[in-house]
């Protein structure tokens, strides 16, 4: 995802590695953007995250309603990390070299938004398309709807990576080398992600949203499906409006092939291996080989951090429906009630995330630096994931007591259990704000000395996010099945990974260097 080439002709030693800083002669003075314009570009994240919030809160239960068992549901999510690993570096590479009259990043952002619209249509109407193609009715697997859903889901993840990577790259371009603006840009991005989350989870938690769009409920698409479809209508409208607004106000100047060649020549001279760069994957491999030690440690801490996060992000509402509420997919109302309670928890989480996003600068100064803050919140993450075990056992004890008293259908969990679960969601907003901001800001400072471009460098940090996601997607289903099919085993592994990430953040991750002018590529203005 995020990363930058640190340039300026000086050599700064950090943990035994030199960061080459030299001014980029092709950066126009007008590229230095105001905070207002940085915020406008960052606002696109609200549209992206609105859709992601719907994915995280509603799609795992939805695929199970289509007939995909829990063990296999995690494999559906492989498309996200796989597309992130391939698409984002690819888009970054070509956006670095784009000579469009609209600029380097804006064409990719616009294309990503258009692809999101196509994907949302396929996902929302998967059940209808499946029924029209001959899927059976009732509580059975619907293979054609599943196929349409999977295609739409893959397109959606490709679209999000096509959109989000260049959006972060444009923010880095606009920061024009200022560490302060870089930190603010990432904080703005995190803040608008929180706003998008709040909107998405609020929409997902309202069980009668389909009444606003009555045509969404059909014979093949029940109330839950119609609500999901309605949420996606709102999502794509928000994304298109924000994208058009940002791309209309913030301009990029067209660059020429000669300027690209000049930048490539400069990078080749700074390349530690002394060899010319190979296209795309060759550059990505070269970037990984030439990474300075601070960036390698950052990638390791980030990878452990995402091993901790991804099980909960993937199965949080499913955990509420099954373990906390004791429901079963497609049977009775308890599971649906739990999913909607989980969406409420995610909305509360996003409110905390938004407040924290605007407080990161002050908190980092208060605790002694960004790396120390990241270590502290990783401990908070580990404690919260461990507390899911306590909440689950309390809910099970409550249900067992009702079975003993002869109750055929247990009621929803008591207020104390539900409050404990929602408290976990709320507190997790604190470390999530840091996860969405600090790694990208540090990557901008610990930029790779591989000579890769702004967009391609984003793919380097992204690898530390998508590879753990692939690992969790492949292993969480079988791992959970070994312990009875619940979500807790993956959450416990996440708690261990968060603890390891905190230890490495405290002990190995170096502090960023003093403010230095980080050469930005030809930016927007």
From Swiss-Prot:
Which chain regions cross the lipid bilayer?
A: 38-58, 72-92, 107-127, 145-165, 184-204, 230-250, 295-315, 338-358, 373-393, 422-442, 455-475, 488-508
Where does this protein chiefly localize? membrane
Q: Does the keyword Transport apply?
A: yes
One Pfam short name: MFS_2
| Topology within the bilayer | Multi-pass membrane protein
Q: Which UniProt keyword terms apply here? A: Membrane, Sugar transport, Symport, Transmembrane, Transmembrane helix, Transport
Q: Per its record, what are the GO molecular function terms?
A: sucrose:proton symporter activity
For the Cytoplasmic compartment, the record's topological domain ranges are 1-37, 509-525
| UniProt keyword annotation of Zinc present | no
This chain's function reads: Responsible for the transport of sucrose into the cell, with the concomitant uptake of protons (symport system). Can also transport maltose at a lesser rate.
Q: What is this protein called?
A: Sucrose transport protein
Q: What is the lineage of its organism?
A: Eukaryota, Viridiplantae, Streptophyta, Embryophyta, Tracheophyta
């Amino acid at each position: 995802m995020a990363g930058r080439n640190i340039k300026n002709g000086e050599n700064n030693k950090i943990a035994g590695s030199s960061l080459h800083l030299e001014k980029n002669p092709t950066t126009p003075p007008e590229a230095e953007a105001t905070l207002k314009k940085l915020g406008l570009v960052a606002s696109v994240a609200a549209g992206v995250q609105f859709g992601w919030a719907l994915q995280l809160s509603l799609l795992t239960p939805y695929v199970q309603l289509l007939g995909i068992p829990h063990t296999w549901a995690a494999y559906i999510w492989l498309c996200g990390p796989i597309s992130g690993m391939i698409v984002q570096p690819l888009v970054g590479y070509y956006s670095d070299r784009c000579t469009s009259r609209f600029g380097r990043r804006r064409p990719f952002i616009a294309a990503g938004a258009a692809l999101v619209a196509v994907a949302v249509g396929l996902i929302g109407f998967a059940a209808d398309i499946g029924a029209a193609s001959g899927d059976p009715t009732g509580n059975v697997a619907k293979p054609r709807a599943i196929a349409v859903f999977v295609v739409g889901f893959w397109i959606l993840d490709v679209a999000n990576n096509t959109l989000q990577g260049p959006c972060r790259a444009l923010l880095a371009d606009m920061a024009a080398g200022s560490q302060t603006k870089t930190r603010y840009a990432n904080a703005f991005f995190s803040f608008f992600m929180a706003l998008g989350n709040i909107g998405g989870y609020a929409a997902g938690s309202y069980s009668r949203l389909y009444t606003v769009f009555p045509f969404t409920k059909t014979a093949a698409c029940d109330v839950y499906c119609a609500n999901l479809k309605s949420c996606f209508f709102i999502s794509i409208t928000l994304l298109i409006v924000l994208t058009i607004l940002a791309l209309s106000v913030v301009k990029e100047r067209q660059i020429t092939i000669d300027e690209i060649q000049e930048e490539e020549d400069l990078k080749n001279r700074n390349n530690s291996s002394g060899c010319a760069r190979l296209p795309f994957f060759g550059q990505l491999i070269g970037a990984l080989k030439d990474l300075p030690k601070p960036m390698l440690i950052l990638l390791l801490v980030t990878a452990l951090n995402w091993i901790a996060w991804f099980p909960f992000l993937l199965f949080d509402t499913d955990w509420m429906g099954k373990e906390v509420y004791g429901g079963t997919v497609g049977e009775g109302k308890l599971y649906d009630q739990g999913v909607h309670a989980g969406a409420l928890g995610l909305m509360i989480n996003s409110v905390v995330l938004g407040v924290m996003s605007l407080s990161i600068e002050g908190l980092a100064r208060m605790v002694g630096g960004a790396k120390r803050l990241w270590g502290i919140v990783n401990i908070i993450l580990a404690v919260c994931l461990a507390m899911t075990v306590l909440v689950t056992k309390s809910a099970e004890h409550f249900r067992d007591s009702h079975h003993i008293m002869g109750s055929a259908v247990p009621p929803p969990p008591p207020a104390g259990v539900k409050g404990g679960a929602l408290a976990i969601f709320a507190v997790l907003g604190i470390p999530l704000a840091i996860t969405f901001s600090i790694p990208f800001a540090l990557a901008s400072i610990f930029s790779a000395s591989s000579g890769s471009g702004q967009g391609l460098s984003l793919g380097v940090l992204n690898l530390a996010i998508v590879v753990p996601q692939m690992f969790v997607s492949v292993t969480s289903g079988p791992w959970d099945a070994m312990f009875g099919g619940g979500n807790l085993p993956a959450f416990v592994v996440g708690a261990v990974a968060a603890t390891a990430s905190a230890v490495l953040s405290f002990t190995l991750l170096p502090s960023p260097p003093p403010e230095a002018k980080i050469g930005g590529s030809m930016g927007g203005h």
